[in-house]
Curated annotation (Swiss-Prot):
NCBIfam families: PRK10216.1 (NF007581)
Gene that specifies this protein: yidZ
Protein name: HTH-type transcriptional regulator YidZ
Annotated DNA-binding residue span(s): 25-44
InterPro entries linked to this entry: LysR-type_TF, LysR_subst-bd, Tscrpt_reg_HTH_LysR, Tscrpt_reg_YidZ, WH-like_DNA-bd_sf, WH_DNA-bd_sf, YidZ_PBP2
Pfam families, A to Z: HTH_1, LysR_substrate
Recorded family membership: Belongs to the LysR transcriptional regulatory family.
Entry annotated with the keyword Nucleotide-binding: no
Length: 319
């Protein structure tokens, strides 16, 4: 027999959404400002209503059942529409509005000043919180700690960072694609040699530790060729690798996205860019789609929609 929503306490749906986000009774209780016991009682009521366990315990926390997974997007959309209704009287002039972004650096630094100006023009009382993109950023989006992420993914078939590998709860839009190139100081001895794979591998390299990994698609392509680069230094950010490659008498090579030319121009780094010495099919595996990422529950959030369009317009020249 079909159940009527009039017999369901709608507060239970908020509890259900937070349990899906947090995968923890304790964390959901903290966000609701109630005790874990109260959340457990709410979960028991939800299980009775849906006649399904909804979540089972696992080593990583609460694991959703197939029914719960199938309801996630509908639940998020329902909660989003509820929030829009509640915001109607005052959302035109929000106070205390906060924009929380996680972005690859220096990608965001290129346009941060322009982006902040547009935000403050529209929302004068807003605050902006920017964090570096790292291994936890996708989970932070899922947890609701980040509104939008802006980062590069990978194209190599064996990569863990493919767009097709993103969690089902994450929506995305590719703003532009980039092929990395090799950055070296203007008086580097490699510039006096024939630029080929042997020259590229003859010199020591700076690697970027990306989402807890020191290797990426470049190393996969080299492995397919039976070759390997010498990694002399591992750094967390592209701008650090560019800074080190630009130092006098430094033989280090940095491999970084082509868009870094904008960053280099801003900071007047004495660097030259050379193409990676690979054929077209190998270059294709190294393409980096730079992508906006957000949770599906925010797909119709006016603040997030406006922010997505603003970032998209700012980076249109790089497409």
């Amino acid at each position: 027999m079909k159940k009527s929503i009039t017999t369901l306490d709608l507060n239970l749906l908020l509890c259900l959404q937070l349990l899906m986000q947090e995968r923890s009774v304790t964390k959901a209780a903290k966000r609701m400002n109630v005790t874990p016991s109260a959340v457990s009682k709410s979960l028991a009521k939800l299980r009775a209503w849906f006649d399904d366990p909804l979540f089972v315990n696992s080593p990583l926390g609460l694991s959703p059942t197939p029914l719960m997974v199938s309801m996630e997007q509908n639940l998020a959309e329902w909660m989003q529409m509820s929030n829009l209704l509640l915001d109607k009287p005052h959302h035109q002039t929000p106070r205390g509005l906060k924009f929380e972004l996680a972005a690859e650096s220096p990608l965001m630094m290129i346009m941060l000043n322009a982006l902040s100006k547009r935000i403050y023009q529209r929302y004068p009382q807003a605050t902006i919180k920017l964090r570096n993109w790292d291994y936890d950023s996708l989970d932070a989006i899922t947890r609701g700690e980040v509104d939008i992420g802006f980062s590069g993914r990978e194209s190599h078939p064996r990569s863990r960072e493919l767009l097709s590998s993103l969690p089902l709860a994450i929506d995305y839009e590719v703003l532009f694609s980039d092929v990395p190139c090799v950055w070296l100081r203007k008086d580097h001895p490699a510039l006096h040699e024939t630029w080929n794979l042997d020259t590229f591998l003859r010199y020591p390299h700076i690697s970027i530790c990306w989402e807890q990994s020191d290797t990426w698609a470049l190393d996969n392509v080299l492995q397919e060729l039976g070759r390997e680069r010498t990694i002399a230094m591992s750094l967390p950010e592209f701008e650090q690798s560019l800074f080190m490659a630009a130092q006098p008498d430094n033989l280090l090579l940095a491999t970084a996205p082509r868009y870094c030319q904008y960053y280099n121009q801003l900071h007047q780094l004495p660097l030259v860019a050379l193409p990676l010495p690979f054929d077209e099919s190998q270059q294709k595996k190294l393409e980096v789609p730079f992508t906006l990422l957000w949770h599906k529950r925010n797909s119709h959030n006016p603040k997030i929609v406006w922010l997505r369009e603003t970032i998209k317009n700012l980076y249109a020249s790089m497409a």
